[in-house]
A protein has these predicted regions:
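Short, hydrophobic-biased segments on the C-terminal half of alpha helices
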Residues: 45-46
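Key DNA-contact positions within bacterial/archaeal DNA-binding proteins
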Residues: 39
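Short capping segments at the starts of secondary-structure elements
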Residues: 22-26
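A short acidic, leucine-rich amphipathic alpha-helix
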Residues: 29-32
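Amphipathic alpha-helical dimerization/coiled-coil segments
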Residues: 69-97
């Protein structure tokens, strides 16, 4: 999948940001946090998992999603998110002075 396909969707970006911050979450919690229904959330998670960016593990009947630590794409996206958020924080600090 091309980077514009991953980052060109607002809900996928929200999923990636939330998982980067929280570590791992179940589908219902991800859906609640991005403001989407279960079916839409599952579709986005499947796209990200099929591309190797995310992975899931089963905890009983609950499916928990997280970044795939073996994926270079996942590492690059996590780095991008972290650097972007640091830049935003510095920008806010600069505006408040």
């Amino acid at each position: 999948m091309r980077i514009e396909d991953v980052l060109g969707n607002r809900q996928r970006i929200k999923i990636l940001k939330i998982l980067n911050q929280m570590g791992e979450l179940n589908v219902s919690e991800i859906a609640r946090r991005i403001g989407a229904n279960h079916k839409t959330t599952m579709r986005h998670l499947k796209i990200l998992e099929d591309d190797g960016i995310l992975q899931h593990k089963m905890f009983g009947r609950i499916r928990l999603y997280r970044f795939n630590i073996n994926s270079e794409k996942a590492k690059a996206i996590q780095s991008l998110i972290e650097n972007w958020e640091k830049t935003e924080q510095r920008g806010l600090a600069f505006q408040n002075h």
